[in-house]
Curated annotation (Swiss-Prot):
Required for replication of brome mosaic virus (BMV), a positive-strand RNA virus. Residues 524-539 have a biased composition (Polar residues). Residues 135-153 have a biased composition (Low complexity). It is found in: Cytoplasm. This is Oxidant-induced cell-cycle arrest protein 5. It comes from Saccharomyces cerevisiae (strain Lalvin EC1118 / Prise de mousse). Coiled coil: none annotated. Residues 135-159, 250-271, 524-544 are annotated as: Disordered. GO terms for cellular component: cytoplasm. Keywords: Cytoplasm. The gene is OCA5. Residues 50-441 form the Rab-GAP TBC domain.
Amino acid sequence: MHDKKSPMANSHYLKNLKQQFRNKNLIETTIHLVKCNDHDSLAFLARTYGVPPQLRHVVWPILLKYHPMCISPNITSNTISWDPITNDFILNDPFLKSKAPTDKQDKSDDENILPYDIESIILHDLKKYFHSRSNPAGSSSNANTTNIATPTPVSSSDASTISSMEVLSPSLDYEFQIIETLKNAIVKFLLKWSKIFKYESGLAWIALGLAEWYPIYPYETMSPFNETHSFYEVEDYVVLSGRKHALLSTNNGNNGNSNSSSNNTNNNNTNITSGMHNLSINTNTSLHNSPYISHTLSYLYKEYPLPFELRSKLPTKPIFSFSALFERLALVILHCPDTILAHKQLKNDSNASSSSKANSNFNTNYFPIISGGDLSFQTQVFFKVFSSILPELYQPLTEESSLQPSSSRNSWIYWWLKCSGAKALQRQDRGRVWDLLLGWRPKPNMDTINFFLNYNDKKMDHLYHDTPQCDNEQYWMKDWIALYNNDPFWFPDLDSMALGSKKFPYDYSVFKELILRNRYGGTQSKAQKDNTVPSPGSDSNDKSELKLPFSSIDPHMQLIFIFIAILQFNEFKLLEFEEAEIPEFLNNVPLLTKFDDSSYRKLYENTESSITSLPSSPTTSTMASLQSSSNSSAHISNYHMLIEVGNDAKASHCFDDLLNMAGDIWRKWLWRELEESSL
């Protein structure tokens, strides 16, 4: 007698099936785009679908190479601040409480050399990743020794058996070299930027977060980085696998204990570093008979398998050293527009205006919810949205000590907002959040770029394109763009407005137009229509030209609404917590994207089944089935849309659902603000 599956089970199976189709097609498309260096399309996929975890070490350097905030950087300063009373800059006390300055320190500052005690503090913070928590109770492992996963010879016939790894204790020297390399990357950043940014522990955790996806070479200080060196020609590359991964072992006698602990990532905080040894594409390799065994990324490919045929298409030479890539990532995470310049521009425009009301309200007109503000503004918006969207949770949280930390570095708000989820989010969730940051792109014209980067004096629009640049782009990108023909943070008519133009130079001028266009029963005048630009997702008579959708708002503002969505997703759980449990939860958020993570881990299992037998590119039927099941809010046309506020249903363990929830919160909250404003 055949067992009948319940409708719920069938629905779950179909969802997994569609997700596997989509993820496999996404991996193949991403590899194709990497091969032809189509960074515009890669950025689009990163900010909408996310970069497959198997490919972040290849895609992230490309995204950061062309990121506007890296080409024209400006970061928040923790050494100086603007005093509106004296109308001048003042020196801040560093977040790091150091000893009274000595002659040696004063001299080192003048020579742009870091104070003598900074490196020891950096090392102390880095070691917390490896040793801050002991092994699970009952473990015989030394709590002060990390574990390294050493690959053994395997067959390449099955991606799931790419590296059978036995956990061994590395030498202390090897671990020291790993930490030393991370420290040197931070030191290089500080030597370059220390005039405006002093060391904070967030830098250590940003470096560690990058090292969980991008390989580092522990002996970089002894053997300088060379772009001609392949990842696969140099031994001893390392990728960190996260603080909370359980011990992996296929051959030791404690396998049962390891497996049981692996089911609870919150209880096992032992770090595993993946020893990334010689990966060769030479069929005469002396290490293994396999022509292409990835030991350089052995742990990563064990977690997230990638078949031999696809691995062989990946580039082998790194674009950046780890320290260079870390600097670029830090520039994006710590980015801040020039708020002083923005205030001056608003004041000058107000003085030039004949309206005394405009002159008196120029300060209230500065509300850069679209173009982005500094950390203080982001924090203000976060709590403003929090209190508006989740009042039941906001009130008890504001009464708890979790919002009154003794140090900003110990606060979950610090890790969430200033460090973009470093330390507080799980490795998988943080990787997906950073995909969004690194994939952010404004429309490729200087008016729009300067709207977001108001300090910019570089011409860079020629680096970006609004159409895919790969050959046969229709074949690879058409269906993906059809699934997400709008930015997740779209707002009615926002995409059709020429941001940064003379008509819309500031956020408040955009808000005025949005109110005018989206009033219920309102109509769009001819003058309004003349000041619109075509929407990427709109139908055009020219069907041969495929347009990429671009980002609608600043990426750090996007993160605010993603974090609010995380709170909404965990609202009932947080309401039930004891006071002491709340900050622990917020500083160590459990894995949010279980469904996504499981799908990528099991993507190439049962390779003989029909599920995994995909064509070499996305098919119309496959992508059509995905399109029909995708969230409808992402597909609505941009033309004069009136907001329809629906229910914010609790999301499943999928980042797409979380992203859609964040977009809904953004639209709901902003419309409330616009309706209540006096613009």
